[in-house]
Structures are given as C-alpha cells and as structure tokens.
Amino acid sequence: MRVNVTLACTECGDRNYITTKNKRNNPERVEMKKFCSRENKQTLHRETK
C-alpha cells in the first residue's frame, strides 16, 4: 500500500516535496537529499507527519 508523504527541509523547515512510499517495505521515516530553494543548496529532507 503506497501512501503520500511530505518531505520537509531539516535546516529551514520548509515542506518542499511530496512523494509516495510503500509502508510495508519502508516502515521508518524517509530521508532524502533534495534541493532547497530557500537555502539554495542540497539539504537533507525528512518525512513529516
């Protein structure tokens, strides 16, 4: 079962991206390096509730 998750920048807190994940294969929170337009660089983005 795939669910939509929101990714938030760990440095500025902006919620920049929406993606999907499979809860059965990835029960923990998703972390990805993505581009943050406010920081103007690649930062770590984590799944929010």
Swiss-Prot record:
Superkingdom of source: Bacteria
UniProt GO BP: translation
Sample GO molecular function, one term: structural constituent of ribosome
Signal peptide, first to last residue: none
Entries under Pfam families matching the protein: Ribosomal_L33
Record-linked InterPro entries: Ribosomal_bL33, Ribosomal_bL33_CS, Ribosomal_bL33_sf, Ribosomal_zn-bd
GO terms for cellular component: cytoplasm; ribonucleoprotein complex; ribosome
Keyword Transmembrane found: no
UniProtKB keywords: Ribonucleoprotein, Ribosomal protein
UniProt cross-references to HAMAP family, sorted A to Z: Ribosomal_bL33 (MF_00294)
PANTHER family referenced in this protein's UniProt entry, alphabetically: 50S RIBOSOMAL PROTEIN L33, CHLOROPLASTIC, LARGE RIBOSOMAL SUBUNIT PROTEIN BL33C
Family of the protein in this entry: Belongs to the bacterial ribosomal protein bL33 family.
Record-given protein name: Large ribosomal subunit protein bL33B
Top-level taxonomy: Bacteria, Bacillati, Bacillota, Bacilli, Bacillales
Gene it is expressed from: rpmG2
